[in-house]
């Protein structure tokens, strides 16, 4: 759910309510984000905090997304200046919100962080509630900046795996995620596929591959994944999930720093770690 400020329409609220409590974020017109979350999993006490709560410690996640070609910024700029609409550059100026069906899977290791106790159905519901928190946060950015909304596909419980010893993944995520989603969810039943895990890394498996089937090739729509040992909060949702899904929607790396990996020549124009999706 989401809301807009009565006195300040530039202020926005987005929240979810589930069996794990209320989780909300408030975005004011100064750019600050405030959060409301339970103090702990079993607590009725809530805390209000901002992004500074997470500290400034750098989390070691590597983006392994690779580019098959470089980005020609002069060519893109020329097409935009000339108002040219082609198959590879589309100008969306119709103010429409576009919805994409997201098939989001997870490994047993990820599920173990959030499943808690109870029956299998209850444990999957707990994991899905955490996934909802994540995508709710991603949508806050994507709807505002890109006009994109992600909605979960039906039967997503079928790709929430609770046991690491029996889930489909064994260290390789791109191809296995795409194959699992195609088989379990159905290749025609989702537009973008992703996996949450606890690895120290992420990869979209492609750039600009949303809605593409491509017979399990490197441009398949379901090859994305993101993982952190502590896969929760904005350091995971925004810094990494938004980043990897951004590749799937066609974004290249923008950060320009000495130790950057997987350089996309022509697009690294922002200092340090960058600020764009």
Which positions does each model-derived feature cover?
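Short, hydrophobic/proline-enriched secondary-structure or compact coil segments at domain edges
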Residues: 21-28, 191-196, 224-226
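A general structural signal for short secondary-structure junctions and capping/turn motifs
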Residues: 14-17, 25-26, 92-94, 183-187, ...
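Short loop/turn segments at secondary-structure transitions that flank enzyme active sites
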Residues: 9, 30, 108, 200, ...
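The catalytic-center signature of Zn2+-dependent metalloproteases
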Residues: 153-175, 216-277
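Fold-level signature of zinc-dependent metallopeptidase catalytic domains
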Residues: 42-218
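N-terminal prosegments of processed precursors
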Residues: 1-44, 51, 173
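Residue-level detector of short, conserved catalytic/binding motifs and their immediate flanks
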Residues: 22, 100, 192, 237-238, ...
């Amino acid at each position: 759910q989401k809301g807009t400020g009565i006195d300040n329409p530039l202020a926005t609220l987005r929240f979810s309510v589930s069996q794990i409590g209320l989780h909300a974020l408030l975005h004011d017109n100064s750019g600050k984000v405030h959060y409301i979350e339970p103090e702990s999993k079993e607590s009725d006490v809530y805390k209000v905090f901002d992004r500074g709560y997470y500290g400034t410690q750098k989390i070691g996640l590597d983006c392994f997304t690779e580019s098959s070609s470089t980005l020609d910024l002069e060519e893109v700029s020329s097409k935009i200046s000339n108002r040219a609409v082609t198959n590879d550059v589309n100008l969306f100026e119709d103010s429409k919100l576009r919805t994409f069906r997201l098939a989001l899977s997870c490994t047993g290791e990820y599920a173990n962080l959030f499943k808690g106790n109870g029956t299998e159905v209850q444990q999957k519901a707990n994991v899905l509630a955490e996934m909802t928190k994540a995508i709710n946060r991603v949508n806050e950015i994507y709807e505002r900046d890109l006009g994109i909304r992600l909605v979960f596909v039906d039967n997503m419980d079928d790709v929430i795996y609770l046991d690491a010893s029996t889930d489909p993944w064994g260290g390789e995520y791109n191809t296995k995620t795409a194959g699992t989603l195609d088989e379990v969810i159905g290749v025609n039943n989702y537009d973008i596929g992703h996996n949450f895990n606890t690895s120290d890394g992420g990869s979209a498996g492609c750039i600009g591959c949303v809605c593409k089937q491509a017979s399990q090739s490197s441009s398949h729509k379901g090859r994305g994944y993101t993982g952190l040992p502590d896969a929760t909060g904005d350091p995971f949702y925004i810094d990494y999930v938004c980043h990897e899904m951004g590749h799937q929607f066609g974004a290249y790396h923008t950060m320009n720093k000495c130790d950057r990996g997987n350089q996309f020549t022509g697009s690294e124009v922002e200092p340090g770690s960058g600020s764009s999706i």
